[in-house]
């Protein structure tokens, strides 16, 4: 794959960001597989209720809303979480609709962090971390930023879809890709035509003389 040009003028390979995306996608796929197990569905609501315990009083309406909203249809929401995580994982690995995938995954991760992980709290004595979903959101934000600076990714489904669907870059890229430029010194169609015409004229002139 062609290296990306950075501000310093040095060329850096573009494959590391693709390796990060695919590796992160594999991690998400493993996590998604676990969401399809019966244990996740059976303990889904208990996990949210457990995180609501000990939270500050001003957060009580937030957790009450999600508990009351999901409780009548717990199985549906448990399956929905499994489906969303699976789709995100597959999109990451394949490099499909990357911009939409990254933004959707950021929103989804923050929602998980604010419900099933209780914002990483309650932050009392003995608390040791702020939750994993917020870290996932940061990684997705980093991937989104990398896609802005590195541009299209050859190791992705988007790269090939963009060749066939002109507007797909709006789904896949954070900015419009620059038009492909011919390498320096490479003959263009116009140059080749002009050269051919010049050679033909020169040949006719020699014949005339």
Go through the PLM ranges and name each one.
Residues 1-84, 94-209:
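Extended, low-polarity transmembrane helix blocks
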């Amino acid at each position: 794959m062609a290296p990306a040009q950075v501000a310093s003028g040095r060329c850096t390979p573009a494959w590391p960001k693709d390796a990060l995306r695919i590796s992160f996608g594999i991690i998400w796929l493993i996590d998604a597989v676990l969401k399809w197990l019966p244990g996740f569905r059976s303990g889904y609501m208990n996990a949210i209720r457990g995180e609501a315990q000990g939270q500050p009083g001003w957060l009580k309406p937030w957790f009450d809303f999600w508990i009351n909203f999901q409780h009548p249809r717990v199985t549906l929401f448990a399956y929905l979480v499994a489906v969303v995580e699976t789709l995100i994982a597959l999109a990451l690995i394949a490099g499909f609709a990357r911009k939409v995938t990254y933004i959707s995954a950021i929103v989804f991760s923050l929602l998980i962090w604010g419900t099933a992980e209780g914002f990483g709290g309650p932050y009392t004595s003995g608390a040791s971390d702020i939750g994993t979903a917020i870290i996932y959101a940061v990684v997705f934000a980093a991937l989104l930023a990398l896609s802005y600076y590195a541009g299209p990714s050859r190791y992705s489904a988007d790269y090939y879809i963009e060749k066939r669907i002109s507007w797909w870059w709006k789904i896949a890229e954070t900015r419009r890709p620059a038009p492909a430029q011919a390498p320096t010194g490479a003959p263009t169609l116009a140059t080749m035509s002009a050269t051919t015409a010049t050679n033909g004229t020169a040949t006719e002139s020699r014949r005339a003389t």
